[in-house]
């Protein structure tokens, strides 16, 4: 054993003092002191439970003792009579065994592979013991779940990730998926329950038993987000539902996750075998699948962006050459060739690497390097986490914890340990780059950039600039020199360090080479400098622009085209990561993919870290809006598609925000008890205005109205039970809070809930009955106009159907046309007086006569006027399809409908482009003359005061 360094000797003296104050002070051996000095967790536990130290002396930890964990746990649970006692027993058992594992790990009586086995077996034993105990309790309370033949149905649990691979780290969450074989009902209970309801309740109680924090701590943080549909999906699925999902909707990343999936309990019963056989074809393809490399490259890019986003430094899991890259290297071979090579279907990493060597897929020396680096990094990770039983992979920067890790790894000091770590991670990085690394090569030093070095490093005269910018006028050259000089002066006032200065000196000649040849060089450079000033002290982003020349070109192109994009990049430099893949940059996601992409994005953030979740939502929105704007700028997306994408993006975010708010509320109060017998959550959100009409712009707010479906006498089923309707009110308030909270990435959306019944004076959440009553008996005509553009954007199927029926019923009312005309016209005049430009030389595209609002009012008037005789006119909430319907049902001529649509789309397109230029919707008075004449003619035809009824 190495002698303890000075930092640990000081720690040892403190520990001796604390143990000497116990009622029966133990005799501490040298090895005891070494372990206690390395781990606050172990010393804290042994001070609380000094008898465990005596047990360590009498029965020292053995490498293979994991084989007895289940037996020991059965003894610990033998006297447990209720759930509270179960929670206590599980937590004490976990602490006791984790102390033994940490002890064995520090003293190296167990190797790293054996430690990983111990940690994984402990978790599996506790999951299975808790499941089996709770299954019996649930069967007594609810009846036994059976299939249609009366055969009892079990709960099967897939352990994912490191748990599935038998490689769990010291302080880890556990990723689980719950499944049951067949649908059916419970038998023997007071009343029948569907199997889905039984297993959902069992699953909820199991998660609580493992995850809930009590005075004794917790057992494991349980993460269920890898299940089909993530948080928004059922907690437990039948085999048939699982199979349908993975066959029809399984994503690449779910396939990779399933490589390590393992049934907990090692069961070989027919149901377990059936589930394994069902999943195997999804994971391992029969053909050689080289698409894996690009998919894994994309995943690695996502992780690299995550490292930058969270400012992670010295991260031995996610950093270059870290644990994750070794896992990716191994998975490449498993996923490409695993379908044909059974030896590659191992869940554990080290045996898979051995198979890679035996199959000649990598040189033996590289496999040896990877295996050695993996064991080194995993031991370091476990020692790091054992210090305080905390889930971290970031190396410490304080001397005490550095000394702990250096000694635990067998090095004299931190410097020696750091050198060894760097060598291991570099060896991994070499293999990773060869196999998976980025396709974009560094461009090297372009000789032409030498011409521009003097422009950055020397003080040039205007005449010196002429050869570099022959196309610019003298005034433009003077402006360019002044801009560069000002930027240089600003940089000199910043503390950027020698590395930052070196990278900036590489970047600026490259940037000038691209910018100076442009006709809009001054505009481009002034916008780029705003970005550069925001990142000049963040070397990571400067390096990104140096290393990826394509990214630099995209930055210049987008900033030149749009000050909105330039200011977004300057405010949120994380968005620069989006420029690395031009294919995705100019090609936004498929509209149906936003929900799944956001789900993947949020999976990388701890579920219980609200601040990180809020940041991630905002960053996802900004990244996707950048991609949409890039498609808009390059005209890859027409105006209608821009709004469609912005609307689908908003809906995905609404879904995720409600999910987060729901989880937080249920954790605090439980869920309303009536949901146990119903489908969905008894909650819905109506989108009004631009959201309802599929017309969102880049800075649009969201007009939302909240509905609930909850009987009066319902309470929530949590420990802090509250009235069910109060629960939904607080849920809506929480949703509003999550949208509006300002983080370092800004707010998510401005949300306006004033279109609810009775406006600001009304309840934030309405029952569906109250909403219907208000619309029938109290709503003004303008509120019925708003209803034309309303649709459900989130909600249970029942509420969705009820709202659609109410909306159609209200819109299909018979209305007296002269009165309807007058009320629509008066509301329009009121808006025009309030919002119009009132300047002769200005035309406000939105608010002035002949503009977009007139077109919207014409569409709304026509629906309210004619839906009574043709209910199908209420189907759509967007103007374009409303006009199509008017032509289809012979209410409006096809020529007029097409002309109004053209006018509407043309003006909407201009508003989008003005937004990209950070300009308002006010333009010169002679703009859109033809379109305004068409709108005015249609307004006069349908809504002018002196017209007779037109039918």
From Swiss-Prot:
Residues 449-951 are annotated as: Adenylyl transferase. Residues 1-440 are annotated as: Adenylyl removase. One of its GO terms (molecular function) is ATP binding. GO terms for cellular component: cytosol. InterPro entries: GlnE, GlnE_rpt_dom, NT_sf, PII_UdlTrfase/GS_AdlTrfase. Keywords: ATP-binding, Magnesium, Multifunctional enzyme, Nucleotide-binding, Nucleotidyltransferase, Transferase. One of its GO terms (biological process) is regulation of glutamine family amino acid metabolic process. It catalyses: [glutamine synthetase]-O(4)-(5'-adenylyl)-L-tyrosine + phosphate = [glutamine synthetase]-L-tyrosine + ADP; [glutamine synthetase]-L-tyrosine + ATP = [glutamine synthetase]-O(4)-(5'-adenylyl)-L-tyrosine + diphosphate. Its EC number is 2.7.7.89, 2.7.7.42. Its cofactor is Mg(2+). It is an enzyme of class 2 (transferase). Involved in the regulation of glutamine synthetase GlnA, a key enzyme in the process to assimilate ammonia. When cellular nitrogen levels are high, the C-terminal adenylyl transferase (AT) inactivates GlnA by covalent transfer of an adenylyl group from ATP to specific tyrosine residue of GlnA, thus reducing its activity. Conversely, when nitrogen levels are low, the N-terminal adenylyl removase (AR) activates GlnA by removing the adenylyl group by phosphorolysis, increasing its activity. NCBIfam families: PRK11072.1. Belongs to the GlnE family. HAMAP family: GlnE. This is Bifunctional glutamine synthetase adenylyltransferase/adenylyl-removing enzyme. The lineage of its organism: Bacteria, Pseudomonadati, Pseudomonadota, Gammaproteobacteria, Enterobacterales.
């Amino acid at each position: 054993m190495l002698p303890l360094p000075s930092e640990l000797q000081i720690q040892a003296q403190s520990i001796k003092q604390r143990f000497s104050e116990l009622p029966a002070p133990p005799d501490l051996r040298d090895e005891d002191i070494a372990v206690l000095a390395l781990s606050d967790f172990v010393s804290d536990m042994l001070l609380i439970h000094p008898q465990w130290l005596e047990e360590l002396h009498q029965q020292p930890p053995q490498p293979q003792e994991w084989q007895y964990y289940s037996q020991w746990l059965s003894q610990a649970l033998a006297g447990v009579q209720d759930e509270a006692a179960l929670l206590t027993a599980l937590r004490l058992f976990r602490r006791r065994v984790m102390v033994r594992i940490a002890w064995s790990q520090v003293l190296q009586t167990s190797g790293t592979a054996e430690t990983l086995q111990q940690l994984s077996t402990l978790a599996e034993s506790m999951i299975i013991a808790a499941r089996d105990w709770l299954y019996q309790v649930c069967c007594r309370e609810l009846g036994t779940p059976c299939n249609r033949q009366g055969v009892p149905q079990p709960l099967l649990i897939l352990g994912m990730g490191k748990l599935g691979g038998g490689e769990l780290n010291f302080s880890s969450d556990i990723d689980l998926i719950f499944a049951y074989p067949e649908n059916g009902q419970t038998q023997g209970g007071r009343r029948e329950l569907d199997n889905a309801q039984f297993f959902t309740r069992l699953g909820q109680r199991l998660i609580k038993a493992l995850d809930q924090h009590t005075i004794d701590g917790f057992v494991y943080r349980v993460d269920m987000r890898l299940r089909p549909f993530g948080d928004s999906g059922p907690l437990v699925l039948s085999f048939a539902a699982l199979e349908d999902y993975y066959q029809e909707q399984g994503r690449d990343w779910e396939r990779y996750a399933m490589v390590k999936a393992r049934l907990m309990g090692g069961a070989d019963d027919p149901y377990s075998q059936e589930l394994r056989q069902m999943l195997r074809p999804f994971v391992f393809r029969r053909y050689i699948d080289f698409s894996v490399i690009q998919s894994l490259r994309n995943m690695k890019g996502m992780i690299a962006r995550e490292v930058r986003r969270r400012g992670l430094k010295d991260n031995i899991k996610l950093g270059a050459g870290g644990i994750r890259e070794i896992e990716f290297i191994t998975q490449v071979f498993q996923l490409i060739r695993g379908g044909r090579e059974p030896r590659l279907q191992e869940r554990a990493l080290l045996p898979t690497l051995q198979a890679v060597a035996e199959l000649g897929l990598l040189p033996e020396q590289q496999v040896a390097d990877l295996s050695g680096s993996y064991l080194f990094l995993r031991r370091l990770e476990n020692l790091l986490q054992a210090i305080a039983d905390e889930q971290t992979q970031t190396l410490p920067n304080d001397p005490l914890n550095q000394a702990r890790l250096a000694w635990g790894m067998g090095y004299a000091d931190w410097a020696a340990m750091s050198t060894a770590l760097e060598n291991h991670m570099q060896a991994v990085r070499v293999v990773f780059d060869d196999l998976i690394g980025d396709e974009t090569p560094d461009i090297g030093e372009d000789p032409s950039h030498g011409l521009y070095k003097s422009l950055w490093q020397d003080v040039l005269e205007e005449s010196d600039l002429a050869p570099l910018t022959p196309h610019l006028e003298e005034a433009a050259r003077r402006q360019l020199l002044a801009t560069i000089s000002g930027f240089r002066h600003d940089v000199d006032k910043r503390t950027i360090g020698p590395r930052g200065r070196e990278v900036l000196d590489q970047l600026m000649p490259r940037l000038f080479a691209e910018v100076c040849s442009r006709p809009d060089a001054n505009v481009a450079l002034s916008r780029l400098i705003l970005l550069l000033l925001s990142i000049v002290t963040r070397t990571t982003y400067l390096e990104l622009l140096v290393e990826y020349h394509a990214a630099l070109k995209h930055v210049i192109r987008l900033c030149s085209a749009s000050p909105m994009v330039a200011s977004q990049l300057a405010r949120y430099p994380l968005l620069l990561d989006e420029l690395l893949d031009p294919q995705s940059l100019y090609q936004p996601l498929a509209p149906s993919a936003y929900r799944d992409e956001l789900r993947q994005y949020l999976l990388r953030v701890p579920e219980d870290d609200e601040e990180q979740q809020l940041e991630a939502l905002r960053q996802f929105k900004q990244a996707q809006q950048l991609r949409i704007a890039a498609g808009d700028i390059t005209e890859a997306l027409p105006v209608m598609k821009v709004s469609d994408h912005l609307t689908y993006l908003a809906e995905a975010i609404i879904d995720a925000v409600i999910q987060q708010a729901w989880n937080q509320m249920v954790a605090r109060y439980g869920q309303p008890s009536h949901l146990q017998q119903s489908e969905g959550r008894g909650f819905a959100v109506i989108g009004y205005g631009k959201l309802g009409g599929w017309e969102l712009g880049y800075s649009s707010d969201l007009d939302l109205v909240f509905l609930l479906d909850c009987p009066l006498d319902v309470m929530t089923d949590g420990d802090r039970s509250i009235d069910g309707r109060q629960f939904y009110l607080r849920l809506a308030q929480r949703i509003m809070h999550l949208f509006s909270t300002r983080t370092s990435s800004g707010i998510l959306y401005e949300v306006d809930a004033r279109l609810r019944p009775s406006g600001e004076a009304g309840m934030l959440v309405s029952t569906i009955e109250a909403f219907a009553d208000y619309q029938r008996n109290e709503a003004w005509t303008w509120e019925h106009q708003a209803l034309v553009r309303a649709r459900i954007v989130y909600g249970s199927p029942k509420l969705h159907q009820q709202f659609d029926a109410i909306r159609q019923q209200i819109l299909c009312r018979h209305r007296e046309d002269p009165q309807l005309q007058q009320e629509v016209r008066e509301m329009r005049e009121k808006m025009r007086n309030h919002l119009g430009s009132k300047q002769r030389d200005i035309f406000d595209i939105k608010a002035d006569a002949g503009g977009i609002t007139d077109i919207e009012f014409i569409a709304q008037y026509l629906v309210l006027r004619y839906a009574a005789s043709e209910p199908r006119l209420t189907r759509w909430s967007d103007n374009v399809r409303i006009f199509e319907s008017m032509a289809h049902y012979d209410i409006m001529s096809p020529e007029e409908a097409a002309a109004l649509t053209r006018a509407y789309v043309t003006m909407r397109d201009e508003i989008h482009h003005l937004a990209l230029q950070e300009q308002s919707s006010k333009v010169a008075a002679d703009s859109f003359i033809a379109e305004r004449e068409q709108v005015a003619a249609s307004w006069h035809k349908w809504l002018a005061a002196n017209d007779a009824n037109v039918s």
